[in-house]
Design a protein with these regions (language model features):
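Aromatic-rich carbohydrate-binding modules that target alpha-glucans
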Residues: 2, 8-50, 60-81, 136-184, ...
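A short, Gly/Thr-enriched small/hydrophobic beta-strand-prone motif that recurs across taxa
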Residues: 1-8, 123-134
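Residues in well-ordered beta-strands of folded domains
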Residues: 6, 20, 58, 78, ...
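Catalytic cores of glycan-processing enzymes that make or break glycosidic bonds
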Residues: 103-129, 176-179, 208-891
Length: 891
C-alpha cells in the first residue's frame, strides 16, 4: 500500500519538512520533498500492520528540529477502507489553537463526556474522507455535514450525514465517491443535539472541494481544519481548598480522600465545575509540624499518608484496637486546627495495623502487582529513602553512614518479596498503593460528577528529598530557590529548595518533568504551575543567606564594570558590594543599642565604615547564633543584623566574579540613601533596564526550551501562577502556549492602576479574590482601611464610608462581580464563599489564614470550622451560591 502525504507549509532555505509516524511502537521519520519550498510531499510504501497510524510534521535544518506541530492532537489515519490500495492525504499544519483548552481532559472528560469512537469500516471502491475539528460542541452534541447532492444529504436537515469523533474533538466521515454526482463538492458542518432536536450550522461561507480524478482503491483524505459555530465561550466557577482543610464527621483530624469525594458532591450540587487543591505530595522530613508545608515535598510522585481515608479501609478485627482508634479519631476530629504530629502518628500507626492484618492478601492481588509494575521507577527508591530516613533519624542523606545516593543495583532485592530489603520497605509500597487507589477513585468520582479536579505543581522540592537523593544530577545544591520581594514578603522569599540544573534536564528532553506530569494526570484534569516565572528564571539565593534580598536571577546576564560605568555611575566595587555599615546607619537601625552592636558584632573597617565580625558575617551564622532566642527584643536585634548584611548596592555573580547584578530593592536601603541624587537617578535607570528590559529575549528563549515540552506532556488544562515581578516576556510565552494566567483584582498586572478591572481580564485566565498565600477577603477588608475605602468607592461604586467588618451582603456583591468577569474560570476560596453568610462563616476572620509567605516556618494547619455535612444541610447558603453562579453565566 502507498500513503501519499501532502502538506502546504512555507519554509526558509535549508529547512525541510519531516513526517514522524508512530509505527509498531516506534517512531519512524521520513523527509518530504518540495519544488517550491511550500508544497511538500512524500510517498510511503507500507504493509499495514495496525488499524490506525498517528503522525505529525516537523521542520528540520541539518538534523536539528526547529519546530513541530502541536503534539497533543496528532494527525490520525484510520485504515478502515477495506478496498483501499492507496491513501492520499491533504493535511494542514497544526498550530496550538486559540481554543486549545477545549482539547484538555478538563473539558473532554469532565464537562463534555464524549469519548472517541472507532470509525466503522467502509467497503467503497473509491472513498473521500473528510476530517474536521469541532471543539466547541457541548455535551450531547454530535457533528454532521450537509451539502449538495444525495450523498451529502441535499441540504436537508432530515438527512444530516453523521460523522465519527475518532479522536478528541476531531470528526471524520467516509463518503462513497462512486455515488457523487460531481467532482465539485459544496458542504457545511452542522452540530446536532438530538435530545433537544436542535441543529446549529457552522458560520461562514459554504466549503468547497474539487476532487481529483480517482482510481479504484483510492482513498482521498481532506483535513478541513476547524468548524466554527456561533457559541458563546464557556465560563466555569469553582472552589479552592486544601484537602487537609476539609472537615467531616468521619475524618480523623485532617481532611482525607473520602472528604474530597464529599466536597466534590457539594461543589457539583451548586453548579460549580472546578475544585482546586494544594499539593498532596508526601512532605515527611522530620515527622514534626514543620513538615506541614505542602510545597516542600520529598517526592513529586508519592502521596502524603495523612490523606488516607480510614473508613475506606477494612475494619480492624481487634475490638480493643478498633475502639481505641475510634476514640483517638474523635479526639483529633474535635480540634479546631490540625495537630499535624498527632494526626500523622495516628494514621501511620493505623495503616501499620491494617498492613499487619490485610497486607499479605492485598499485596498478592493483581491490582497491587499492576501498581508496582506501573510505578516502580519512582516507588522503589522512594520506599528505600523513607526506610533509610527513619532508620538514620534524619532525611539529610549526606549524614547517613551509607546509601548517600540511590544505588540502582539495589532495585532487584527491593522488589523481591523473599529478601530482607523488600521486607524493610513493603509497608511504604502498601501505603502508596492504598493512597493511589483512593485518589484515583476520587478523580473518577469528580469526572462522573462533571467536576474538574485541579492540582498544584510546586516549583521546587526539598533539598533532602528523595528526588534529589535519587537523581542529584538534576539539581544545584549550592544555591536556594526563592522569590524576590513582592506584596507577600518585603525581604523576598527563601524556600530553601535546590535550583534545577536545566542544562542536565534538557539533555534527556526533560524526562523527569514529563514523568511528573504524567503521574499527576492520573489524579487531575487541570493543574496550577506554582511560580511559572521559575521556568523563565529562578531567584537564586546564596546558601548562607536567610532572606531573599541577596539573590540573583538564574540564568541572567550579569553586568561588567564597564557596563555599569557606561550608565554614568562611578563603580566603587568595594563600597558597593560590601555591607554599608556606618555610625549613622547603626544609629538609625539600632538606636540605643547601636554601641552594643558595634562592640559585639562589628569590626572597624576604615574611618567611616564597619564590617561584620567573621563569626556573624553571613545571615546563616547570625541565624545559628540566635537559634534558641525567643525574646522579641533579641529577635528584633537579629533581624537588624540580617539587614546590615544585605545592605549592598550590587551582588557579585555567583558563577563569574567579574560580573555584577544590582541588588533587588536596593532603593529601600541605606547604601542607596547615601548616594548623590545624580547617582540615584543613574542607578534607577540601570536598575530598571536590568530588571525589566535587559533579559526579555533571553528569558523568552529559556522558557521556550522547557515549557512547550511540559505543557504538551499531558492533556491536563494548564494554568499558571504568574504573580510577582513579571517580565514582559512572560505574557508572550503564555499567550503562545495558551496557558491560563492568574488574575487578582487586588494585585493588577497593570502597574498604572491600583485595582484591576474585572471586565478586562483575559478570557484565558483564572480569576480569584484571594489565594492561600494571602489574607482572606474578610482579613484583607480590615487590613488597610484607606485602601479598602478606595476600593469601596472606585471599584464597587458605592458612596460613603466602607462598613467594617465586611458584611455578608457586601461579600456577596464582590463575589458576584468576580463571577461576572470575563475570565474562563472563577475559582474562589472556601473561606471567601463562606464570607457571604454571617451565620455560617468563622467568627474570627484571622483564624481563616492558610499561609503567611513572609514566615518560612509557618504552621499549615487551617481547617474548616464547619463539617461538610453541616454545609450540605445549609440549604439557604447552597442555594445562594447556586444563584450567584447562574447569574454570573457560569453554568
Amino acid at each position: 500500500m502507498i500513503i501519499h502525504f501532502h502538506i502546504s507549509y512555507k519554509t526558509m532555505f535549508g529547512e525541510q519538512i519531516v513526517v514522524n509516524i508512530q509505527k509498531d511502537n516506534e517512531e519512524v521519520k521520513f523527509p518530504l520533498t518540495t519544488l517550491d519550498g511550500e508544497r511538500w510531499s512524500y510517498d510511503w510504501c507500507v504493509e499495514p500492520t495496525q488499524q490506525a497510524y498517528t503522525y505529525f510534521y516537523s521542520v528540520v535544518r541539518e538534523g536539528v528540529v526547529l519546530k513541530t506541530e502541536w503534539l497533543l492532537v496528532k494527525h490520525r489515519l484510520d485504515m478502515t477502507a477495506k478496498k483501499a490500495a492507496e491513501y492520499t492525504l491533504y493535511d494542514h499544519w497544526k498550530v496550538i489553537p486559540q481554543d486549545s483548552y477545549l482539547y484538555s481532559s478538563a473539558f473532554t472528560d469532565c464537562i463534555n463526556h464524549q469519548a472517541p469512537q472507532e470509525m466503522k469500516p467502509c467497503n467503497y471502491a473509491k472513498t473521500v474522507r473528510i476530517i474536521v475539528r469541532a471543539p466547541q460542541l457541548r455535551d450531547g452534541e454530535r457533528l454532521g455535514l450537509l451539502g449538495a447532492g444525495q450523498v451529502l444529504g441535499n441540504w436537508n436537515l432530515q438527512n444530516v450525514v453523521p460523522m465519527t469523533q475518532h479522536i478528541y474533538n476531531e470528526w471524520a466521515v467516509d463518503l462513497d465517491a462512486t455515488q457523487l454526482q460531481s467532482s465539485h463538492l459544496e458542504l457545511k458542518f452542522v452540530a446536532v443535539d438530538k435530545k433537544k432536536s436542535q441543529v446549529l450550522w457552522e458560520t461562514g461561507m459554504n466549503r468547497t472541494i474539487d476532487l481529483p480524478e480517482m482510481e479504484a482503491g483510492e482513498v482521498v483524505v481532506y483535513d478541513l481544519d476547524q468548524a466554527f459555530f456561533a457559541l458563546y465561550n464557556r465560563k466555569l466557577a469553582g472552589t479552592q481548598v486544601p484537602v487537609f482543610s476539609l472537615r467531616s464527621k468521619k475524618s480523623a483530624g485532617v481532611g482525607d480522600f473520602g472528604d474530597l469525594k464529599t466536597m466534590i458532591d457539594l461543589v457539583a450540587s451548586t453548579g460549580q465545575k472546578v475544585l482546586q487543591l494544594l499539593p498532596i505530595n508526601d512532605t515527611t522530613i522530620t515527622h514534626t509540624w514543620t513538615d506541614s508545608y505542602p510545597y516542600s515535598c520529598i517526592s513529586v510522585f508519592a502521596i502524603h499518608p495523612m490523606y488516607v481515608d480510614l473508613h475506606a479501609l477494612p475494619e480492624l478485627k481487634d475490638a480493643k484496637a478498633r475502639a481505641a482508634a475510634e476514640k483517638k479519631r474523635e479526639q483529633l476530629n474535635s480540634l479546631s486546627q490540625i495537630d499535624y504530629e498527632q494526626v500523622n502518628d495516628f494514621k501511620i500507626n493505623y495503616l501499620h495495623q491494617i498492613f499487619e492484618q490485610e497486607g499479605k492478601k492485598i499485596m498478592s492481588g493483581a491490582d497491587f502487582k499492576a501498581f508496582i509494575l506501573e510505578t516502580q521507577q519512582w516507588l522503589v527508591p522512594y520506599a528505600q529513602y523513607s526506610y533509610l530516613r527513619d532508620k538514620n533519624g534524619t532525611a539529610d542523606f549526606t549524614q547517613w553512614p551509607d546509601h548517600n545516593v540511590w544505588d540502582e543495583a539495589e532495585r532487584k532485592d527491593l522488589t523481591n518479596p523473599e529478601t530482607e530489603a523488600y521486607q524493610n520497605v513493603e509497608l511504604f509500597y502498601f501505603v502508596q498503593f492504598i493512597l493511589n487507589k483512593q485518589m484515583q477513585e476520587a478523580h473518577e468520582h469528580a469526572k462522573a460528577k462533571g467536576v474538574i479536579l485541579k492540582g498544584d505543581i510546586p516549583i521546587g522540592v526539598h533539598r533532602h528529598s528523595c528526588d534529589v537523593w535519587m537523581e542529584p544530577k538534576y539539581f544545584n545544591m549550592n544555591g536556594q530557590a526563592g522569590a524576590p520581594p513582592d506584596d507577600f514578603s518585603v525581604n523576598g522569599q527563601n524556600w530553601g529548595f535546590p535550583t534545577y540544573n536545566w542544562d542536565e534536564m534538557l539533555k534527556d528532553g526533560c524526562q523527569w518533568w514529563t514523568r511528573r506530569f504524567l503521574n499527576m494526570s492520573k489524579y487531575f484534569d487541570a493543574y496550577r504551575i506554582d511560580h511559572v516565572l521559575g521556568f523563565f528564571r529562578i531567584w537564586e539565593i546564596p546558601v548562607d543567606s536567610v532572606h531573599g534580598l541577596l539573590g540573583q536571577f538564574a540564568p541572567s546576564l550579569g553586568m561588567t564594570r564597564e557596563e555599569i560605568q557606561g550608565y554614568g555611575l562611578n563603580f566603587q566595587e568595594d563600597r558597593f558590594t560590601r555591607p554599608f555599615i556606618t555610625d549613622w546607619v547603626l544609629d538609625r537601625m539600632f538606636h540605643e543599642r547601636a554601641d552594643e552592636v558595634k562592640e559585639k558584632y562589628l569590626d572597624r573597617l576604615d574611618d567611616e565604615r564597619y564590617q561584620m565580625k567573621p563569626e556573624v558575617d553571613t545571615q546563616r551564622k547570625v541565624e545559628a547564633l540566635f537559634a534558641d532566642v525567643t525574646d522579641e527584643k533579641e529577635i528584633w536585634l537579629r533581624d537588624g543584623l540580617y539587614a546590615l548584611i544585605s545592605d549592598v548596592l550590587f551582588v557579585r555573580d555567583r558563577k563569574n566574579p567579574e560580573l555584577f547584578h544590582p541588588r533587588i530593592s536596593a532603593q529601600l536601603d541605606f547604601i542607596y540613601e547615601s548616594l548623590y541624587d545624580s547617582d540615584k537617578v543613574v542607578f534607577n535607570r540601570l536598575y530598571n533596564d536590568y530588571f525589566y528590559r535587559r533579559h526579555n529575549q533571553f528569558w523568552y528563549g529559556e522558557a521556550m526550551k522547557k515549557l512547550p515540552k511540559l505543557v504538551q506532556a499531558t492533556r491536563m488544562l494548564v494554568c499558571a501562577e504568574d504573580l510577582g515581578m513579571v517580565p514582559d516576556c512572560v505574557p508572550w510565552v503564555m499567550d503562545e502556549l495558551k496557558i491560563l494566567s492568574l488574575e487578582l483584582q487586588s494585585m493588577p498586572k497593570d502597574p498604572t492602576v491600583k485595582f484591576g478591572h474585572l471586565s478586562r481580564n483575559p478570557y484565558r485566565s483564572v480569576c480569584t479574590i484571594t489565594s492561600h498565600d494571602m489574607p482572606t477577603l474578610r482579613m484583607w477588608w480590615d487590613e488597610n482601611i484607606s485602601r479598602t475605602q478606595e476600593y469601596y468607592n472606585t471599584m464597587l461604586y458605592r458612596e460613603g464610608p466602607a462598613p467594617h467588618p465586611l458584611p455578608g451582603w457586601l461579600a456577596r456583591d464582590i463575589i458576584a462581580r468576580h463571577l461576572a468577569s470575563s475570565s474562563m474560570l472563577c475559582i474562589l476560596s472556601v473561606q471567601d464563599w463562606l464570607a457571604i453568610d454571617e451565620r455560617l462563616r468563622q467568627p474570627s476572620a484571622d483564624a481563616e489564614r492558610i499561609n503567611i509567605p513572609a514566615n518560612p516556618k509557618h504552621y499549615w494547619r487551617y481547617r474548616m470550622h464547619l463539617s461538610l455535612e453541616e454545609l450540605a444541610a445549609s440549604k439557604e447558603f447552597m442555594e445562594n451560591i447556586t444563584e450567584l453562579i447562574a447569574q454570573g453565566g457560569r453554568i
